[in-house]
Design a protein with these regions (language model features):
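C-terminal helical subdomain
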Residues: 2-6, 191, 195, 199-200, ...
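Active-site-adjacent segment of SDR/Rossmann-fold oxidoreductases
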Residues: 163, 184-195
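Substrate-binding pocket helix/loop in short-chain dehydrogenase/reductase
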Residues: 88, 113-115, 122-124
Length: 257
């Protein structure tokens, strides 16, 4: 049963004070909004993404609005590897000495075409970014997360990762895999109770990926990423302590009040 919390949730200003959170795909869209929201609620944010220019812009915004200490980590998850993830682990430990949360937001859409016509190279690329990279990064960071008293890992899902639909190819399959990864990791960490793991389906949101998937859709009819930040903050912060292995939908939430 999908997880649910009060849509009127209002996070306190210091919700994430003293915490360190990694956000992948932090350069724009939902990742950018989440990184800003986390920093504005006290977290030191590790900004990971493919385009350094975009990450630097988010870094500058965080520095202008908060007293937190963000860092920029340019990384193309199409090339995610065990060695690269180990380097990330050591960089975070060296810079902060801790890690309290990970938002796996980065993802590739891939072609909107049938399985019969889906290019194998595109399939492998989408699966690597959306599934393999999330596994590789999470695996490398588990020692840090396990040292936190209250760590949170949030995987980004999709409606087509819960019910398959034609023409969604590797993207849909990758999100089914992400849901499975979430459930397995949540079950593995439940007994110790130090790391909680959930998935979040942002739904129809005004992002570049949504525009690519639905080019004829009017983006003004969709909520901007900031409208979903109450749920992103809830899952990353201590108010969701003890909630793990759940599937959340942003459509069930309203903006923080």
């Amino acid at each position: 049963m999908p997880g649910k919390a009060d849509g009127a949730y209002t996070p306190r200003a210091d919700l994430l004070a003293g915490r360190v959170v990694l956000v992948t795909g932090a350069g724009d869209g939902i990742g950018r909004a989440a990184a800003l929201a986390y920093a504005e609620h006290g977290a030191d944010v590790v900004l990971l993404g493919r385009t350094e220019r975009k990450l630097e812009a988010v870094f500058d915004l965080i520095e202008s609005r908060t007293e937190t200490r963000p860092v920029v980590v340019p990384a193309d998850l199409e090339h995610a590897s065990e060695d690269a993830a180990t380097i990330l682990y050591h960089a975070i430990r060296r810079e902060y000495g801790r890690l309290d949360g990970v938002l796996h937001n980065a993802g590739l859409l891939g072609p909107r075409t049938s399985i019969a016509e889906y290019p194998v190279s595109d399939w492998l690329e989408v699966m690597h970014v959306n599934v393999n990279a999330a596994f590789i990064v999470t695996r490398a960071l588990m020692p840090l997360l396990g040292e936190s008293d209250d760590a949170s890992v949030v995987f980004t899902s999709s409606g087509v990762g819960r019910r398959g639909r034609a023409q969604w190819g590797a993207y849909a399959v990758s999100k089914f895999a992400v849901e499975g990864l979430m459930e397995v990791l949540a079950d593995e960490t439940a007994r110790a109770g130090r790391v909680r793991v959930n998935s979040l389906n942002p739904g129809a949101t005004r992002t570049a990926m949504r525009a690519a998937a639905y080019p004829d859709e009017d983006p003004r009819a969709l909520p901007p990423p900031v409208d979903h930040m109450g749920l992103y903050l809830y899952l990353m912060g201590p108010d969701s302590r003890g909630i793990t292995g759940q599937r959340f939908d942003a459509a069930a939430w309203s903006s923080p009040r």
